[in-house]
């Protein structure tokens, strides 16, 4: 019989962090973050990491494991997570995966596409063409791989670059290659989803962004930019700097627009990201959904989820 792993998923701002800690205590679990930006060191406020106090309450994994000037693939994430999961089981605890990033979750449960290594010279060549002619790369991808282009936002240069890079190196469309996935991790995944009414979620997001600014996000971004400038070995776009909050504040610090405009953009893009997460998670199979609209009684919500989980975990 496959060992069981619990996944707690939901859109950004829904309350997963606080809820996960309470569920973990009830389950005697350790938490594994599946957030692609919480992996980066020094990026605490903008990624809404669990506080140090929260991490003392329950052991957390996959947080602060990579420098923001480094690159970290989904494949690398999975390799580390496999070891983390086994060690949690050795301690006779339950792994509680909290996310987050749909790609990480899907890689765990369904497998991952293993593409070629990054070609920085090719990426720089493509980026130079994009600078000379904005929109060039997305239009090129639409010609080469229209199926993949339909799934990527025109502004998502990192994913557009990767799709083009794979095509030029493999001579095949990434949409075709992604059908040939590696095997998923060999566990029984129990998926719990938490959601809120969209209007309420958007209000929470706006309040959270304001709180991040008041908590020192601008200074945090300035510090991260200084560290990257001092340590980065490549001029290629860094995934860490594409994180919502960091990208917009960096633009403000570069005098591209005002702080008010940066805050407006962060709120707008965070809402768009939450909407994409809704769409992504709704496509996932076998999720037990809990609508927590209007609720912040996380102790009671955790007990309700634990009650539902207990029957499944002890089968």
Swiss-Prot record:
GO BP field: tRNA modification
EC numbers: 2.5.1.75
Site description Interaction with substrate tRNA, residues in chain: 101, 123
GO molecular function: ATP binding; tRNA dimethylallyltransferase activity
Region annotated Interaction with substrate tRNA, chain positions: 35-38
Binding site for substrate: 12-17
SUPFAM superfamilies associated with the record: P-loop containing nucleoside triphosphate hydrolases
Protein's job: Catalyzes the transfer of a dimethylallyl group onto the adenine at position 37 in tRNAs that read codons beginning with uridine, leading to the formation of N6-(dimethylallyl)adenosine (i(6)A).
Complexes and interactors: Monomer.
Protein family according to the UniProt entry: Belongs to the IPP transferase family.
Protein name in the entry: tRNA dimethylallyltransferase
Species of provenance: Thermodesulfovibrio yellowstonii (strain ATCC 51303 / DSM 11347 / YP87)
Protein encoded by which gene: miaA
């Amino acid at each position: 019989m496959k060992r069981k792993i619990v996944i707690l998923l939901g859109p950004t701002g829904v309350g997963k962090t606080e809820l996960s800690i309470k569920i973990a205590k009830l389950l005697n679990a350790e938490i594994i973050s599946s957030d692609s930006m919480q992996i980066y060191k020094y990026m605490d406020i903008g990624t809404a990491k669990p506080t140090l106090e929260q991490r003392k309450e329950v052991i957390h994994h996959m947080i602060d494991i990579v420098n923001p000037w480094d690159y970290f693939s989904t494949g690398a994430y999975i390799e580390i997570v496999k070891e983390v999961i086994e060690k949690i089981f050795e301690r006779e605890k339950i792994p509680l995966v909290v996310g987050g990033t749909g790609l990480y979750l899907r890689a765990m449960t369904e497998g991952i596409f293993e593409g070629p290594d990054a070609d920085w010279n090719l990426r720089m060549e493509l980026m130079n063409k994009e600078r000379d002619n904005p929109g060039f790369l997305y239009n090129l991808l639409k010609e080469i791989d229209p199926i993949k282009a339909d799934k990527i936002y025109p502004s998502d240069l990192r994913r557009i670059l990767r799709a083009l890079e794979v095509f030029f190196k493999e001579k095949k469309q990434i949409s075709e290659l992604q059908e040939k996935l590696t095997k998923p991790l060999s566990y029984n995944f129990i998926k719990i989803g938490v959601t809120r009414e969209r209007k309420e979620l958007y209000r929470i997001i706006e309040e959270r962004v304001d709180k991040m600014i008041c908590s020192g996000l601008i200074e945090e971004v300035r510090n991260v930019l200084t560290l990257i400038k001092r340590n980065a070995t490549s001029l290629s776009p860094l995934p860490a700097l594409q994180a919502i909050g960091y990208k917009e504040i960096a633009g403000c610090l570069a005098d591209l627009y005002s702080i008010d405009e940066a805050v407006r953009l962060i709120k707008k893009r965070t809402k768009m990201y939450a909407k994409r997460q809704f769409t992504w998670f709704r496509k996932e199979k076998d999720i037990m959904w809990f609508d927590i609209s209007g609720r912040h009684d996380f102790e009671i919500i955790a007990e309700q989820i634990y009650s539902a989980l207990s029957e499944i975990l002890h089968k």
